[in-house]
Amino acid sequence: MQRIHLIMLMILSSQVVRAQSADPQYAIIIKGGHVIDPKNNINELMDVAINKVGKIAAVLKNIDPKTASRVVNAKGLYVTPGIIDMHTHNFAGTEPDNYLRNSYYANQPDGFTFRVGVTTVVDAGSAGWRTFEKFKDQTIDRARTRVLAFLNIVGEGMTGGPPEQNNADMDARLSADMALKYNDLIVGFKVAHYNKPDWVPIDRAIEAGKMAGNIPVIVDFGGSGLSLEELTMKKFRPGDIYTHTYGGGGKEREAITDPLTGKLRPFVFEARQRGVIWDVGHGAASFSFSHAIPATKAGFFPDVISTDHHGGSMNSAMKDILNVMNKFLTLGMEVPAIINSVTWKPAQVIQREQLGNLSVGSEGDVTVLRIRKGKFGVFDQMGQRLEGKQRFECEVTVKGGRVFYDLNGLTNPLPKVVGGLPSL
């Protein structure tokens, strides 16, 4: 009898060993692609493996495809860290006449992210300290996209109109307290749409940033007519962000180019040298080739490429993050620099260095891109059109080791969708 039990135990043990040996080491391998990982200075053919807890496990040549549950065929394609769009508006809701705060003009993220390679968005001030928890419950906690946020220095958030001019609702202490409470989600503070000729919102946002652990401020300079040089050379700390870099012009908002000569203002480079971050924030009417062409000819490309994605920009000259990247490709920005501006650089700016790179242990977010050659047009809100010879297209988007988007079925086996969440 004991002998029978021993034999049965041996059989069961051997079955367990076989099951363990048959269990693949990785959840997914992205195989045969040209990897561009700016943090780690990788720019060559490599394979990327993601483990079963959704973290980067290896970036090596010739990883055995049999060691993964799924394999993405990336031959002829570019493989990058998951794209970070650092300027979006996602506080969608049903309140009328509230612009981008819990209203119709903002967009739920998932329908506009994975299909263009975006795995992380940073909402740029749609909510303030009074409204952030509603935004968290309504959007952040329910999205498949990773949603982080700049908190508006205006407590009510980005309602448009008079509330955004209310100095009494710009409370540095209460804003900082909310950022500290949700320091896993709030990455900085936003100033926007302010039209008075004073520095109140910027001073209070910077104060809040210091109180909340020295996190950055991002500024849409509104229509106050104040000096861009003073903002970037005196007010800003290293790491603070100027958005809508290639927009503006006129008396209400200074541009980075001189209106008389059309040339780049010298202080722009000086501000970069002291640590100021220059963000595209394309938007519906905040990007003009009349500024971008002379700036890029002078060698002034953006630190961060972002969209300012909302209902008014998504079907205009902006469209999506890939289209904005295409504009800078057409303007002569090198591919690795473009990838850096939507991956590792924004991750550093928002102090989330587990994102935007393919280091072992980082989040298993990967974007697979095709660079298609041909004739392609890009244009700005003023109707100026440029023609390019290549453009980015998204083939596959992986977030946390799960395939959330696959344009042409390059994943084998293709994931089944269970309850709206792709299977591992």
What is each stretch, according to the model?
Residues 33, 363-417:
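C-terminal cap of metal-dependent C-N hydrolases
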